[in-house]
């Protein structure tokens, strides 16, 4: 191997090293620029933060109202069931009375 080819190979190695480092720096910069652009284009988070506190303040009363609504729905179902029993009981009573009336009319 001659001195010229050795120097040429060494020069290529230096150029490749410098080129690789430059590409690495460029990749890091591109990634940082892309992340900055994404952050800028998503808008402000102030409105999200303001809404989050309002939502958390309303969560406890909302849960309490849900519990009350569940209790009321249970009472409504029970009342409807009792009303249905009363209707059936009244219908049965009416049938008994009608049957007695028929029997008493037939006996005369």
UniProtKB/Swiss-Prot annotation:
Report whether Secreted shows up as a keyword of the record: yes
What does UniProt give as GO cellular component? Answer: extracellular region; pilus
Q: What domain of life is recorded for the organism?
A: Bacteria
Main subcellular localization, coarse class? secreted
The cellular location(s) given in this protein's UniProt record come to: Secreted; Fimbrium
Region annotation Disordered: where it falls in the sequence: 41-73
Tell me what the record says results from residue 61 to K: In strain: r0
Induction remark: Expression enhanced by contact with host cell wall. Also regulated by HrpRS and HrpL.
Bias class Polar residues marks the residues at: 41-56
Assigned keywords, A-Z: Fimbrium, Secreted, Virulence
Q: What does this protein do?
A: Major structural protein of the hrp pilus, which is a component of the type III secretion system (T3SS, Hrp secretion system) required for effector protein delivery, parasitism, and pathogenicity. The hrp pilus functions as a conduit for protein delivery into the host cell. Also, affects the expression of T3SS-associated genes. Required for full expression of genes that encode regulatory, secretion, and effector proteins of the T3SS. HrpA-mediated gene regulation apparently is through effect on the mRNA level of hrpR and hrpS.
Report the sequence similarity comment from the record: Belongs to the HrpA type 1 family.
Record's protein name: Hrp pili protein HrpA
The species is Pseudomonas savastanoi pv. glycinea
